UniProtKB/Swiss-Prot annotation:
It is an enzyme of class 3 (hydrolase). Keywords: Cytoplasm, Hydrolase, RNA-binding, tRNA-binding. This is Peptidyl-tRNA hydrolase. One of its GO terms (cellular component) is cytoplasm. The record marks N9 as: Discriminates between blocked and unblocked aminoacyl-tRNA. It is found in: Cytoplasm. GO terms for biological process: protein quality control for misfolded or incompletely synthesized proteins; rescue of stalled ribosome.
Length: 202
């Protein structure tokens, strides 16, 4: 069994925020693979189903970003899911827009959602890092991640969510490197190889 957790803040106020790209990617996976219906449990909205013949629970924590670990750990304990069967989809300031990377373990790069999960569950889960770019000044980060994606960003955002949905079966088959490679090729083919951040010159 696998746990796919999207990170974001609950409710319509935050739905379009850059910080919520993890929710958006997981929503695309749920639609594509018909996971559902959504039910309130584990301090989350949760959907269940199968991907590539494996049982998957998709988790949208309702704890707000900084307490995501409470929800993830509750579901993990209930189902006794090993850490290397957990994939967390989250926004990544240190990657350019439309870049996707996957890694197991490592630091939290200042991401409070990851910090919370690591504190509650341990470190050896997979992070699916979804690049949103950096505003260029640390003082601007808070406003940047809590602002909605610009209209001009929608094409690459949709493509990133499509890539996650298209290749989610590779995650359920424990083939994370192949997931990353296939997503990279897909985004390249869509013309999103070198995306600029909104407002970036170049």
């Amino acid at each position: 069994m696998f746990l796919f957790a999207g990170l974001g803040n609950p409710g319509p106020k935050y739905a379009g925020n850059r910080h919520n790209i993890g929710f958006m990617a997981l929503e695309a996976i749920c639609r594509r693979h018909r996971l559902g219906p959504l039910r309130r449990r584990f301090q989350s909205l949760a959907a269940e189903g199968e991907i590539a013949g494996e049982k998957v629970i998709a988790l949208f924590p309702e704890t707000y970003m900084n307490e995501s670990g409470r929800a993830v750990s509750e579901a993990q304990r209930f189902y006794k899911i090993p850490l290397d069967h957990i994939f967390v989809f989250h926004d990544e300031l240190d990657l350019p827009p439309a870049k996707l990377r996957i890694k197991k373990g490592g630091g939290n790069a200042g991401h409070n959602g990851l910090r919370s999960i690591t504190a509650q569950c341990g470190n050896d889960y997979f992070r699916v890092r979804l690049g949103i770019g950096h505003p260029g000044d640390k003082a601007l980060v808070h406003a940047y991640v809590l602002n909605d994606f610009a209209k001009s960003e929608k094409p690459w955002l949709d493509a990133v969510c499509d890539a996650c949905a298209d290749f989610a079966d590779l995650l359920a088959q424990k083939r994370p490197e192949e997931f990353q490679n296939r997503a990279h090729l897909f985004l390249d083919a869509q013309g999103f190889g070198e995306q600029k951040r909104v407002g970036e010159k170049g």
